[in-house]
C-alpha cells in the first residue's frame, strides 16, 4: 500500500501497479491504469485525507505500507507497525530539486528487486531533463514570470526563490520575478506588492487552484489589472484531471520533471520546442 498519489506513477513505470491493494481517498488517483484496477475492485478505499481507515487496512494485511510524515511521529503508522505490518517512510517530498524527487523511483526499484530497471528509467528522465535545460538556454527573450495567487485572507502565496518550483523556472531560463528571494517554501505577500512588481509580467504560471479566468475574477476582480490576464497568458495545471477529479500534475509531475520543464519551455518560448504538446499545463480561458 502507498499513501501518496505521487508513488503511483513509479509503481506503474516499474510494472508493479498490481502491488497496490489499498489507498486513502482513491478519487485523488488520476491514472487510467490504476483507476481501472480500482473500478475492478482490486484497490480498496481506505478512508479520506483526514483519517486512514486502519481497520480496513489491517484486514488487507499488505506486505508493507509506504508512507510519509512531516515529523518523526505518526500515531497511525505506529499502530500499523504494532500489528506486524512494516511501515516504510518515503522522504521524496524533502528533495529540493526536480531530478532529486524523480530519483526516488530507485527506492521502489529496491523494494521490488528491480534496481536496474529503476536506474534505466531515471537515467532516461534525467537525460531528457538536461536536454530540455540545454534547449532553454537558446532563449533570447527571457520573459518575466508571475506565479501563485491569493489563497486566503487576501495574502498572495507564491514560490520562494530557492523552492522546487523556482528551480523549474530557472532551468526554463525565464525571469521569475521572485528568483532572488530567500526560502524553499512559499512567500506570503500582499496583493498590492505583487501587483506593483508583476503587473507587466509576460506570463502567469500556476495560479493556485484556479482553473478559469472567471474563477480568478470571482476571487478578486483586481486580477484583471495584470498584463498576463489581459493578454491571455495564464497557464494552469489544474484543468487536466482524472475521471474523479484528481489533478494529473500532482500525481505524475514529481516522477516526470522532464515533461514539466518541457511544458514551461513550450509556454514561454514555443519556437524552441515546435513539435512538443503540453502535458500538464493548459492556457487558462
What are these regions (language model features)?
Residues 1-285:
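N-terminal ligand-binding lobe of clamshell/alpha-beta domains
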